[in-house]
Curated annotation (Swiss-Prot):
Cytoplasmic side: 280-304
Family to which the UniProt record says this protein belongs: Belongs to the natural cytotoxicity receptor (NCR) family.
Subcellular location: Cell membrane
Organism: Homo sapiens (Human)
Full protein name: Natural cytotoxicity triggering receptor 1
Domain Ig-like, first and last residues per copy: 34-118, 129-211
Gene behind this protein: NCR1
Endpoints of the signal sequence: 1-21
Coiled coil: none
Amino acid sequence: MSSTLPALLCVGLCLSQRISAQQQTLPKPFIWAEPHFMVPKEKQVTICCQGNYGAVEYQLHFEGSLFAVDRPKPPERINKVQFYIPDMNSRMAGQYSCIYRVGELWSEPSNLLDLVVTEMYDTPTLSVHPGPEVISGEKVTFYCRLDTATSMFLLLKEGRSSHVQRGYGKVQAEFPLGPVTTAHRGTYRCFGSYNNHAWSFPSEPVKLLVTGDIENTSLAPEDPTFPADTWGTYLLTTETGLQKDHALWDHTAQNLLRMGLAFLVLVALVWFLVEDWLSRKRTRERASRASTWEGRRRLNTQTL
């Protein structure tokens, strides 16, 4: 037992140091664009990065490389910085992330922000077949056409969250939808694009009307459902509440896990220390009894 204890103490110390090092990582900041992540060409956009109070430095990264630095003053009263792009263009479109520093500690990187420049090409036309007014259960198809040759088309439904369906074709793409429900009602637009971050002018809006409620509208999906391989979900970057809640919950869960692991390590160390102390005590007691017995045996021998 005595030889095992130092090894256990070493393992416990290493685990404790690792846990302590993990707890030294600051939670990731929140990043969003104002007024929107889709920015018309030559318009201004502001990228916001929110961390903790006391942060002395914020860094904005573009496509994995350092793009800008901001050092708020006084840091103890500011937990958000803004990075301005006064003239949006295709070179500024792409993926952004940010980090911040408190003292010597750096945070984890934020989620990626996809910044899109629009109005780069001609305006596409959007139509729907069999028409803008359909009955619940029917299937409809949107057609997005752009005479200027492109490689990708995108269909969006206006609303709280912007869902983007991608289609491909030289001058036109088809977007099948359905069977539709009343949840599919709304206003749609489409864009043409040569890549994920440079889009055309938006098409004129097409409003889809779906008549005839399903039996229980409370069970209808809040947003349209499309084939999983064609859909990407873009949450409006001005609505960051859900992202913040998820990030805070993730960080809290990590802290609870680390604290639980540290507690288990501490309990194990205490148990091994108590066991070692009891083992030593039993050894001393056995030695004491053996010594007493040997003394009595010698005394009896001398008496005889």
